[in-house]
Amino acid sequence: MNIVIVGGGTAGWLSALSLSKNHKITIIDSSIPTVGVGESTTDRLVEWLLRQGIDLQEYIKEVNGAIKLATYHVNFSKKEYCHPFNIRDDQEFLDVSTWAYTNNQPVAPLSNFYNLVVNKQVPNSLEGVAIHWQAGLVPQYLEKLLKNKITIIKQQVSNVKRNGNNIKSVVLDNGQEITADYFVDCTGFHKVLVGNDDFESWNDKGVVDSAVVWNEPFKEFCPYTILEAKEYGWCWTIHTKDRAGRGYVFDSSYINPDQARQEIGVPDARTIKFDVGVQKNIMKGNIVAIGLSAHFVEPMEATNIEFTITELDLLDKVFASSMTVDEFNAELYKSAHEIRTFLKLHYIDNPNSNTEFWTNQKNAKWFDKTYQKLIVENDFDYIKQNNWQWYDVFSWLCIVQGLDIKPKHSIDDPALLAKYQLMSI
């Protein structure tokens, strides 16, 4: 199959890596520089890269990568708390996690990585870890890796020729016309191919929509992403091999970029405006949106790259006729909403700030059903009943307990107590 990818960046080159295994790929990369701050990922990316045949040690070296084991939350609650990755996800582990929370025992120490996080160490194995990397280096490395396997065109698309929901061809700045069986839109918030007609905006859902970003010199190694609540949003710190990528994510309906820069004391921080939401139909006709053109929500738990690789895995199924386009779209639409709900949990209550932003976040009505089930009723079976795939009970409980939300009942089970004592050593 002949597939054209429009747009480079992380999404474009990850798409080229995945799709080039079974298809003829042309990537149209305008070579417009990326913002170049640090990017954070989740533990599922490492397993995905291995499936693509990537040498992880080489990859980490080439992208100035560093190991990530957790997210570490500061000023979201009375105390700092940790949401670590964990290798185990079987039902016994999840039952023990629930027992721990309902009996006021720490949940996070059940993770294989908890003690490493506390001591700022990394495991001997790469199993279950994630990576911090320098964003601009990923396309460079993958281009070098794929240059003899795919066609690379350094141009911009000036026109798109359509036939209903399908694209017949794209026309480049130099007048060249490119045809294909399928077109993949990796143009980010520009959405050059997919447009905005089918885009479900979440700007009315109390989501942060802007950021100011900057880099700082390397100070110390931290195997986790630091998230620090601020007056009108939160800051990230992502440690790569030789520097720290920083960003202040905020809601532009409360403050503007200059006010954000003033709050953090970085007058030259660059501004990014997010297009927050999801395409209702990520695949339509012979067009597929991958990456930011398909979906974006604030990068608090580093879900955006994971969403990209999930899209690519499901797209493989569509092309192999083991999944329909309708199933593809429905699963990704549901996933985007699940991610948004999980991130909303982080905003339930911040005792350290009483700004209008935090007050409105706490009172956001669209979260009511999940709040009722998880926080009021402690019905953690609700996660399983809804077939939520992105975050298991352990992750939800790390956030709920970290926010100092007390359990409403306890589980009396000596067997689970014994298992907890073994797992939390």
Predicted regions and their residues:
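Beta1/beta-strand and adjacent pyrophosphate-binding region of the FAD-binding site
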Residues: 1-9
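N-terminal Rossmann-fold NAD(P) dinucleotide-binding loop
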Residues: 12-13
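Glycine-rich FAD pyrophosphate-binding loop
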Residues: 20-37
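Dinucleotide-binding Rossmann-like beta1-alpha1 core, especially the glycine-rich loop
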Residues: 37-119
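Long, low-complexity C-terminal extensions of enzymes
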Residues: 67, 320-425
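Predominantly flavin-linked oxidoreductase catalytic cores and closely associated redox partners
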Residues: 127-260
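Conserved FAD/dinucleotide-binding core of flavoprotein oxidoreductases
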Residues: 229-276, 295-306, 318-321
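Short FAD-binding loop at a beta-strand-to-alpha-helix junction that anchors the flavin cofactor
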Residues: 283-300
